[in-house]
């Protein structure tokens, strides 16, 4: 099932999910895979940001392909845009490893619009900052749109210790360019922990995103 992807030789998938992490987050992988496989029949690609051999073997057994990002200049979550730019799929959906898949998510590929990043609005951040934010825990796209390459370049040229990939993307866009480059996905594809715990969200949930340290505590309780 598994291939190790290199730049020179890769199979192109019509539709694929992709996730990735390093050794500090690998404890969630078995939990993530179990939930994902219950609710998706699509190929899953794993981006190795620097996991242990044990974790890598688990992902080799459960994924269609492995992307090796252990020897790149970006650190941590700044490897996400590089992964997305190089992911070998016509239609790609990135999903964070702290996302709990609770229902069939394969329909997300039918919602993707070309030339855009397809994301769920970050309702908690939007509510608390007064600006429109989108959460990068789930990001879909067709081919490799210009905005994805711009995001990747921005991460390479202006990362800061205080920011993550989501913050870099937000800093690139104004209200007008957001309309051009971001397509809103239904909230159910990325429901954030704060929505459920403090903001009274009562809608459908296909993907529950357990953000922050409190979210990781919730995940540990499920293991």
Label the model's feature ranges.
Residues 1-73, 211-219, 223:
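N-terminal anchoring/stem segment of glycosyltransferases
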Residues 68, 75-133, 140-141:
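GT-A fold catalytic core of metal-dependent nucleotide-sugar glycosyltransferases
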Residues 133-134, 203:
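Short, solvent-exposed loop/turn segments at the edges of secondary structure
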Residues 141-222:
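Catalytic core and acceptor-binding pocket of nucleotide-sugar-dependent glycosyltransferases
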């Amino acid at each position: 099932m598994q291939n190790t992807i290199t730049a020179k030789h890769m199979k192109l998938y019509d539709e694929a999910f992709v996730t990735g992490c390093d050794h500090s987050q690998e404890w969630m992988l078995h939990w993530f895979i179990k939930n994902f496989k219950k609710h998706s029949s699509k190929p899953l690609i794993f981006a190795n940001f620097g996991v242990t051999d044990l974790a890598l073997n688990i992902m080799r057994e459960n994924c269609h392909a492995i992307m090796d990002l252990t020897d790149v200049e970006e650190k941590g979550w700044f490897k996400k845009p590089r992964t997305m730019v190089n992911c070998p799929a016509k239609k790609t959906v990135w999903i964070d490893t702290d996302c709990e898949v609770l229902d069939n998510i394969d329909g997300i590929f039918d919602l993707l619009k070309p030339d855009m990043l397809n994301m769920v609005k970050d309702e908690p951040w939007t509510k608390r900052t007064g600006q429109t934010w989108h959460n990068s825990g789930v990001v879909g796209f067709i081919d490799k749109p210009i905005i994805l390459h711009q995001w990747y370049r921005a991460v390479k040229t202006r990362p800061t210790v205080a920011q993550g990939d989501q913050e870099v993307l937000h800093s690139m866009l104004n209200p007008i360019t957001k309309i051009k480059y971001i397509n809103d996905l239904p909230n159910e594809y990325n429901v954030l922990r704060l929505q459920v715990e403090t903001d009274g969200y009562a809608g459908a949930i296909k993907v529950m995103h357990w953000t922050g340290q409190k979210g990781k505590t919730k995940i540990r309780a499920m293991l």
